[in-house]
């Protein structure tokens, strides 16, 4: 490393930043506003800000605008707040470089509320965005704008229109691959590509930049341009391309490294990839240190490190000496280096990707060049563009077929869950040891080859003395296996109940000491796509690939729409998570929502059963007792005839009451069977018409959990209900304030965890 000072400097920088994070010193710079101003903004949501338009995009419901050099106007004073993302109520005629004055509701960007949730706060903090402005109304705008940046936007829009005409239904995929634009990309398509482990081809990366940049450079050389003009033109073109396609961290990493490589070529210097990678990383981290913990940064740089540092060593360990065997083994090195990152941020790793990338990567250049050729020809003739893009569209059909194969298989991904920091460090310790073993084998093979050439020994005699190398290979394999097992290790032994923050709704995850898993409800009236953005990430982060049962208390949408979405994903092969049973309330009259859920379960291969009063569902040391509805329940009043369950483990009891009201509580009291409980999932999101005083006097919950959104039209939770709970001696926990609430017990002692600590 002494011969590569940039690498040493980068290593020390990363080590220092990592140490700061481990010591509790955050890499995020923090809120740029004074505390008193923050408090006043929270109390008076109407705010006025002024900033320069950097970019904008039109969505289905609003116009999203990114502002830079922004300041807040508060009590005739100006407070700089760096960058802000605003959502305008109506579409405005804006251009990059304009300075605009807008009024709206200014809110801090929040972090995730649930395990596995996307960390918006960190993502935007890397980009110096700490506030969103909702319901924004444009007050003023300047006439001056950046003609250069507007031109780039217009070029991008023209390219998008050409692809729409030339590629038809495949246009969103080509827009993602060639323009870095995923705005119109179907979410299910993204899920299929992710499941198959080929989602990376939809992002602008080093592969794209090298194909386009070097292709342009070589074309210009063949046209008669010298090294300097061809190189400088290629440099400029790739820089503009990187800016036009959005300037993501992976794009700018690839563009910067291309600039360094081309600079070395035109000046006659030797290009060192590790030094270029180090310089690029330092440039990004100096501008925003928080990128060190950004998934895009870690995966982009991790892939290059895997190919540059680990590939040859892993090939040596695997005995891969020929080109085709190295081509098979090298991607494994990349996967090994990025494995902890994938698990930390996504909870799963595509196993199918090991195989499918061998088929996809050699051909993705055809797709990219086909898209680019269509863009160029489309300026003159759309029919010609349709013709030239046809082979690329055929390849996309092949990719979709591969994705469907992966989706049908339950083994295509490993859901290992989110590892702890110590697990990641131990894994990398094992991996580094394995790489040293690979380096040793590589050197020994080189020495033996040299000896055999000098002494004219036969290859058989050289290999005969390789027993030591075989032993090292076996040891390395064991080390890797142990490291991976440690990475996916999740200690059991206790009961864990996670009340997810689903906004206005319910979603509860139960993990038993014997590693059985259940979902109780899963729906929301305030959050869309709950299955994709909440339930799936939460399950993956906990390492759950199998749900023993999904309980449905009743069929209101705020309890079932996420579950239905999850079942549909299972049926379509968009997730490898599977379930055993869907347990529905035993109603005589089954509403449409009940039947639709049952049908979705059938398509997903999930068995359907019903449960009513008196049913016991044992699962090892844990049991579910159904207290309601009665076996002759009609199901006409879905709230009052919701499924009520008691979860028991040792001396611990927890009561789940769905959306029942005072009438059903009276019936439960009259029927007997209720007893003291340690934890109560408060009925109907804290409604004033539920959780009566008499009911609380009987069950005496030590902890009560209320699940609802911070702002809702129902007035949940009702102040009267909260007062009754406190009067009963209950510790009241709210998902709306602290995100997911976790109840963990060994059957005797109780521990409460809040996902959001602030």
Language model feature labels by segment:
Residues 1-12, 465-474:
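N-terminal Sec-pathway targeting helices
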Residues 13-16, 20-200, 457, 532-537, ...:
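Membrane-interface helix/helix-cap signal primarily in integral membrane proteins
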Residues 17-18, 186-354, 370, 416-492, ...:
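Hydrophobic alpha-helical transmembrane segments in multi-pass membrane proteins
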Residues 148-166, 170-173, 178-181, 189, ...:
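Hydrophobic alpha-helical segments of integral membrane proteins
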């Amino acid at each position: 490393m002494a011969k590569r000072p940039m690498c040493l400097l980068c290593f020390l920088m990363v080590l220092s930043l990592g140490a700061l994070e481990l010591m509790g010193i955050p890499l995020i710079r923090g809120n740029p506003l004074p505390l008193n101003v923050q408090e006043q903004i929270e109390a008076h949501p109407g705010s006025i800000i002024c900033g320069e338009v950097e970019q904008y995009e039109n969505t289905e419901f609003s116009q999203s605008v990114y502002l830079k050099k922004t300041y807040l106007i508060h009590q005739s004073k100006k407070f700089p707040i760096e960058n802000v993302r605003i959502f305008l109520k109506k579409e405005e005629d804006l251009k990059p470089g304009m300075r605009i004055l807008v009024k709206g509701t200014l809110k801090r960007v929040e972090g995730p509320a649930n395990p596995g949730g996307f960390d918006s706060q960190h993502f935007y903090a890397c980009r110096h965005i700490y506030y969103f402005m909702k319901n924004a109304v444009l007050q003023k705008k300047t006439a001056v704008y950046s003609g250069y940046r507007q031109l780039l936007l217009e070029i991008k829009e023209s390219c998008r229109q050409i692809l729409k005409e030339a590629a038809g239904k495949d246009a969103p995929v080509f827009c993602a691959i060639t323009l870095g634009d995923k705005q119109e990309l179907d979410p299910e398509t993204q899920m299929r590509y992710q499941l198959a482990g080929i989602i990376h081809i939809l992002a602008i990366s080093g592969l794209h930049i090298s194909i386009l940049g070097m292709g342009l450079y070589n074309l210009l050389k063949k046209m008669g341009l010298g090294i300097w003009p061809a190189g400088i033109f290629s440099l400029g073109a790739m820089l503009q391309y990187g800016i036009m396609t959005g300037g993501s961290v992976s794009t700018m990493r690839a563009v910067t490294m291309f600039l360094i490589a081309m600079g070395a070529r035109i000046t006659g210097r030797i290009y060192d990839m590790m030094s270029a990678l180090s310089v690029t990383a330092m440039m990004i981290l100096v501008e925003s240190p928080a990128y060190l913990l950004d998934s895009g940064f870690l995966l982009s740089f991790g892939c290059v490190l895997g190919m540059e540092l680990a590939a040859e060593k892993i090939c040596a360990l695997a005995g891969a000496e020929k080109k085709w065997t190295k081509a098979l083994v090298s991607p494994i090195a990349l996967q090994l280096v990025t494995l902890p990152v994938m698990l930390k941020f996504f909870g799963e790793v595509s196993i199918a990707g090991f195989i499918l990338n061998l088929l996809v990567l050699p051909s993705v250049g055809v797709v990219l060049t086909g898209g680019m050729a269509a863009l160029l020809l489309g300026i003159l003739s759309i029919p010609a563009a349709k013709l030239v893009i046809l082979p690329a569209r055929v390849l996309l059909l092949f990719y979709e077929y591969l994705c469907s194969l992966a989706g049908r298989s339950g083994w295509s991904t490993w859901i290992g869950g989110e590892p702890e920091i110590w697990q990641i460090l131990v894994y990398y310790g094992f991996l580094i040891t394995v790489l040293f073993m690979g380096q040793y084998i590589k050197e020994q093979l080189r020495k033996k080859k040299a000896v055999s050439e000098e002494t004219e020994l036969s290859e058989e005699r050289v290999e005969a003395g390789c027993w030591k190398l075989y032993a090292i290979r076996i040891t390395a394999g064991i080390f890797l296996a142990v490291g991976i097992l440690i990475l996916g290790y999740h200690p059991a032994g206790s009961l864990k109940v996670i009340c997810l923050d689903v906004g206005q709704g319910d979603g509860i995850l139960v993990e038993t000491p014997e590693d059985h898993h259940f979902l109780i409800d899963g729906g929301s009236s305030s959050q869309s796509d709950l299955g994709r953005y909440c339930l799936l990430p939460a399950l993956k982060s906990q390492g759950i690939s199998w749900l023993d049962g999904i309980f449905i208390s009743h069929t209101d949408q705020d309890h079932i729409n996420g579950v239905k979405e999850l079942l549909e994903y299972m049926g379509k092969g968009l997730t490898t998570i599977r379930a055993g049973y869907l347990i529905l309330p035993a109603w005589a009259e089954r509403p449409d929502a009940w039947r639709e859920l049952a049908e979705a379960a059938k398509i997903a291969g999930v068995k359907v059963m019903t449960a009513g009063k008196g049913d016991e569902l044992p699962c090892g040391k844990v049991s579910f007792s159904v207290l309601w509805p009665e076996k002759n329940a009609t199901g006409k009043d879905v709230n009052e005839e919701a499924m009520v369950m008691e979860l028991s483990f040792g001396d611990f009891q927890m009561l789940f009451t769905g959306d029942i009201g005072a009438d059903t509580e009276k019936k439960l009291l009259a029927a007997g069977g209720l007893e003291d409980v340690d934890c109560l999932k408060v009925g109907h999101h804290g409604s004033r018409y539920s959780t009566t005083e008499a009911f609380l006097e009987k069950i005496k919950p030590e902890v009560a959990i209320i699940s609802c959104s911070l702002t809702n039209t129902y007035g949940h939770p009702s102040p009267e209900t909260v007062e009754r709970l406190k009067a009963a001696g209950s510790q009241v926990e709210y998902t709306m304030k602290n995100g997911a609430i976790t109840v963990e017990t060994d059957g005797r002692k109780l521990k409460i965890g809040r996902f959001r600590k602030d």
